[in-house]
């Protein structure tokens, strides 16, 4: 079949969207992120119409189609218990056909591969898992992001870098912590120290409903 179908799966913040953007940049193709709230409709036939527009334009402009967190469209199909279920499965059948016929690149991202219907899984040429960075990789991410800051001083010792690297966070979460630390340090006209960074880490852990002591 024509085209290339790619599935990225893994926890939030592990780089799925960033990798899609890098791929587009390397191939010099625009990555079109599909807003599922604008595509999926409760009205019969509307979802197919919206998908048709997206695929037609993407084929004409040679876009890379990126279904970010596309579980609403690519999720497991329901049993035929009602007329609504039958229409939902018609949407799936239509989407399967458009994917089969699409000559370009399609990327789907999801947090859980098991959420994706097997009918779609069979059609992906590449399935890649994005995992959380290990402690060494986290240390490298912390060092890279904090060393790039120019608007204020960063005052963390080697021991403190090692300490913050012990907390399991995604690359996206570490980026959020660094941005929080930078904003707070600039607001108070102070250097970034371990206390501010720990505040940012706690904020991220609360978002994920994870409790820890630092």
Where are these regions (language model features)?
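Walker A/P-loop NTP-binding motif of AAA+ ATPase domains
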Residues: 1-163
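C-terminal alpha-helical "lid" subdomain
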Residues: 123, 135-136, 140-214
């Amino acid at each position: 079949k024509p085209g290339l179908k790619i599935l990225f799966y893994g926890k939030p913040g592990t780089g799925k969207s960033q990798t899609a953007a890098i791929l587009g940049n390397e191939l010099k193709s625009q990555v079109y992120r599909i807003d599922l709230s604008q595509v999926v409709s409760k009205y019969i036939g509307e979802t197919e119409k919206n998908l048709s527009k997206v695929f037609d334009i993407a084929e004409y402009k040679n876009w890379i189609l990126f279904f970010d967190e596309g579980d609403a469209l690519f999720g497991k199909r329901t049993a035929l218990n009602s007329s609504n279920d039958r229409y939902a499965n018609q949407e799936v059948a239509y989407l399967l056909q458009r994917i089969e016929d699409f000559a370009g690149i399609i990327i789907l991202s999801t947090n859980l591969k098991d959420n994706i219907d097997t009918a779609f899984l069979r059609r992906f040429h590449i399935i890649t898992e994005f995992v959380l960075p290990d402690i060494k990789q986290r240390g490298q991410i912390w060092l890279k992001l904090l060393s790039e800051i120019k608007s204020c001083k960063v005052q963390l010792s080697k021991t403190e870098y090692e300490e913050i690297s012990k907390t399991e966070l995604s690359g996206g979460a570490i980026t959020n912590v660094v941005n929080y630390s930078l904003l707070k340090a600039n607001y108070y006209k102070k250097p970034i120290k371990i206390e501010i960074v720990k505040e940012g880490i706690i904020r991220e852990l609360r978002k994920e409903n994870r409790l820890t002591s630092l």
